[in-house]
A protein has these predicted regions:
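Secondary-structure capping and boundary motifs in well-ordered enzyme cores
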Residues: 2-3, 28-36, 74-78, 82, ...
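Active-site SXXK
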Residues: 4, 31-57, 85, 144-148, ...
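Short, well-structured active-site flanking segments
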Residues: 22, 36, 46-64, 101-105, ...
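Sec-exported extracytoplasmic/periplasmic mature domains
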Residues: 41-50, 62, 87-91, 99-103, ...
Length: 318
């Protein structure tokens, strides 16, 4: 992700049947599910929406107009922080956060991340959950996550640096024309990454974690009836997004939802063999403080630390 170079791309399974055949990584648009929570909501919320990882929403039944939003397990957790909502992929908190910061802001950030398939009809609260008109390509979703891994700087995915003829003359050159732009602050990127590290240790991505001291972060995603199952993850070295589903959009059984995580785990484990142990570098400007987990604010003495359910104090990065 530090160069934008595409090291490997798989457009389908099975034996190759020809050249320039349908490539599901570049040609197919599919619904990204909860992987889009980071791209269409939380990145904007932390970067420009006045939210922090400690900010809370009331995870409770929520209806806007005729649309009722639910969590995937149909349960509700009350006042919940953004960090925990990312870790456990809680829909209600995400939708309420996008409502707070404004759909237009989330939409703009998603475009800045390199998502080119958005339409005006996507300017609604379903954007927070990846409910898109056309969907996204795996390549562009990978580029978006690589932006976070790269400290907030988007680099256009490139498949070559130069193409030369037999005389050494340059025919195609990507060394000077690669699109590059800052999408989010490096501090925002680090905070998102820190939250997504929890996804692999405490949340919906435990199955994706490979056995290594190299830092890993990521986000899961599924759509209705498991028609799309995704795992978007990265390390300080590489970003990889895996999608699984049927071309005809058929339902998948629940047991198949783990396949993208297992594929990511096995592939990334091999790719990182022999690489130096590395963590994501914390940029200047990051600090931490003790807050009340039920308000996201500085605690009041004798209240947050005296809850009958136990102390509500927690330490968070800002």
């Amino acid at each position: 992700h530090s160069t934008g170079e595409v090291k490997a791309l798989v457009g389908g399974r099975g034996d190759k049947s020809g050249n320039r055949t349908w490539n599901r990584a570049t040609d197919t648009c599919r619904q990204p599910g909860s992987t889009f929570k980071i791209i269409g909501c939380y990145a904007a919320a932390l970067d420009a929406g006045g939210k922090t990882l400690a900010s809370v929403q009331d995870d409770a039944p929520f209806t806007v107009g005729s649309k009722t939003f639910n969590n995937y397990d149909k349960s509700f957790g009350g006042f919940t922080s953004i960090r925990w909502a990312i870790t456990k992929s809680i829909n209600i908190v995400t939708v309420k956060t996008l409502q707070d910061i404004g759909v237009e802001l989330g939409y703009k950030y998603a475009e800045d991340f390199g998502i080119s398939t958005l339409t005006d009809s996507d300017k609604n609260l379903s954007l927070a959950l990846g409910g898109l008109t056309k969907g996204v390509t795996n390549l562009e979703l990978t580029g978006a996550y690589a932006t976070i891994a790269n400290g907030g700087v988007y680099l256009e995915p490139k498949f070559y640096t130069q193409v030369l003829d037999h005389d050494g003359k340059v025919l195609l050159d990507k060394t000077e024309t690669q699109d590059s732009r800052t999408v989010i602050k490096d501090t925002t990127a680090w905070l998102l990454t820190d939250a997504m590290k929890d996804v692999l240790t405490q949340g919906t991505g435990k199955l994706a974690r490979f056995d290594s001291q190299i830092a890993q972060a990521g986000k899961s995603g599924t759509t209705t009836s498991n028609r799309d199952c995704l795992w978007a993850g990265y390390t300080p070295y590489y970003t990889c997004v895996v999608w699984g589903g049927y071309d005809d959009n058929s339902k998948q059984s629940g047991k198949l939802t783990s396949y993208p995580k297992n594929i990511w785990k096995n592939a990334m484990s091999r790719i990182h063999e022999g690489l130096e142990t590395k963590d994501f570098v914390q940029p200047d400007g990051i600090t931490n403080a003790t807050v009340c987990s039920k308000s996201g604010l500085l605690p009041l003495g004798g209240i947050c630390d005296n809850d009958p359910r136990g102390s509500m104090l927690t330490t968070e990065y800002f």
